[in-house]
Swiss-Prot record:
Organism this protein belongs to: Priestia megaterium
Protein name, as recorded: 4'-phosphooxetanocin A phosphatase
Binding residues annotated for Mg(2+), in chain numbering: H31, H66, D67, D132
Residues the entry annotates as binding oxetanocin A: W17, H75, S78
Family assignment from sequence similarity: Belongs to the 5DNU family.
The encoding gene: oxsA
Domain notes: Has a mononuclear HD domain phosphohydrolase fold.
Reactions it catalyzes: 4'-phosphooxetanocin A + H2O = oxetanocin A + phosphate
Keywords, comma-separated and alphabetical: Cobalt, Hydrolase, Magnesium, Manganese, Metal-binding, Plasmid
Length: 194
């Protein structure tokens, strides 16, 4: 019997930002949805600005499953995952999880998911990584906006990194200009049909 459906629903139980006080709790499923949506927007901006075509199906599927290994590893914050001592062992652990998660699936589905998870398109990986970073930054902005002082240094650090990335990636700069200048919006008029 396959565990895929259970894994999908279990991701709702995997908290993000564990160890940090949050006004609004977040799980991996919620985060994945935001990363998918942001990846789509970034892709559209990149295509427009650079005049190129990106395989959106591959991109969005990769974004959908980008953190599926956290069903086993749980969410580990980036500074820990990217620590020079822990980075290689952690990546090896993630590979081991990827290789074992979908063992009992029909071969075609297993092959498809394996192809998605082991995506070697660097452009797609980059867009999803940027979307992942933008989502973390947005989360920190929301928490700070609500008065959570625990996220002030997180917001500053993520914002500085984002500012540096926008110097190299015009589509990120465009995203920042379009969506992040006043985020989160104080006035949510879009909720009312006037």
């Amino acid at each position: 019997m396959s565990s895929l459906l259970d894994i999908i629903y279990q991701l709702r139980q995997v908290p993000r930002w564990d160890g940090s006080f949050q006004f609004e709790k977040e799980d991996v499923s919620q985060h994945s949805f935001s990363v998918i949506a942001i990846s789509h927007i970034l892709c559209e901006l990149k295509e427009t600005l650079e005049g190129k075509k990106i395989n959106k199906e591959k991109l969005l599927l990769y974004a959908l499953y980008h953190d599926v290994t956290e069903v086993v590893s749980t969410h580990i914050i980036s500074p820990v995952k990217k620590n020079s001592i822990l980075k290689d062992p952690f990546n090896a652990f993630r590979e081991q999880i990827k290789n074992s998660l979908f063992d009992n699936l029909p071969i075609t589905l297993s092959d498809t998911l394996s192809t998605i998870l082991n995506n070697n398109d660097l452009e797609i990986q980059e867009i999803v990584e940027h979307a992942d970073h933008v989502d973390a930054y947005c989360k920190s902005c929301i928490e700070v906006h609500r008065g959570n002082k625990d996220f002030i240094s997180i917001q500053r650090s993520l914002g500085d990194k984002l500012d540096n990335l926008t110097k190299e990636y015009p589509y990120l700069k465009e995203f920042q200009n379009l969506f992040l200048k006043d985020f989160p919006l104080e006035n949510k008029n879009y909720r009312y049909l006037n």
